[in-house]
Amino acid sequence: MIYLLGASHLMAILDACAAPGQPSAVPAIGQGQAPAFRECALRDGVLPDRLRVASIHVGHTAPFWGPALVEMLPQGPLGIAAGFQALLTGANTDATCLTLFVSLRGEEYFNLGLAGVDDPFDFVLPQRPDLALLPGHAVIPLDVIQAQLDQQLARTLLTLTAIAKLCPRLQVVRIPCPPPASSDDVAAWAATRDRPERAHRVATSVRLKLWLLYDGLSAQFTTGLAINSLPVPEQAVHRLGTLKADYMQDGIHGNARYGALVCAQMASVVSQAMKGAL
């Protein structure tokens, strides 16, 4: 059994792997609902094992969830909501499960980028000197950008810490959100849907640098928790590192074609885990 936990970025994966006639959009667990993974009927040959999915939101608050999924208590240890604890403990104790894939949030870099819509900013990312500073943009020190991203990421990283703590038996794998699409691609997407989309008004290179910093911080943190991260599929990105138009659902989400590439990565990870368990 494969377990998959996340929110909106799950949809690309489910669009790619769900059996015909199977709703690909797994409803998010309601705030008044007991937590549970739901089995998803799959297309033949997409994944090497059955799949159970739970769609959550890190901001859940309700009787089953508590004030938050995870919070840092004043005395230091993690406070894990009862519903979330039950969800994870159930996965960890399922003897048929070897791997839990996790795709949480992903909009943190996007939210920070929106601050540049009215007041354009830029910053130097040392590992990408090709992404030069843009004229007319206020230059913000890297440590200031990183501190703001750390704030955006805080709740997600606490949630990942709880997952690692409650699922010690499982191989936990982080699925990163896709990189941003180019400004031109997002603008074209917005125009075809007759809706405003502010994201394309932030320069492509700035959004890409924010994503690279965000993904690097996330991967570094999860590595310390013994959580591996899937790479972004090379076929889906331009040489610069932005998401190709053929693989985008909107400015920040991948589509079913992107999801199919992620499914192939998941299948490889699960197959290796199954061989290792023999």
Cite the ranges covered by each PLM segment.
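Extreme N-terminal starter segment of soluble prokaryotic enzymes
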Residues: 1-3
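Active-site glycine-centered loops adjacent to acidic/histidine catalytic or metal-binding residues
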Residues: 7
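Short, highly selective alpha-helical patches that border small-molecule cofactor pockets
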Residues: 10-14, 34, 156, 211-218, ...
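Conserved SGNH/GDSL esterase-like catalytic core that processes O-acyl groups on lipids
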Residues: 12-18, 23-126
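Short flexible/disordered coil segments
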Residues: 41-56, 61-67, 172-173, 231-252
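Alpha-helical cap/lid subdomain in secreted, periplasmic
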Residues: 88-244
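Histidine-centered active-site loop/cap adjacent to the catalytic His
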Residues: 209, 213, 245-278
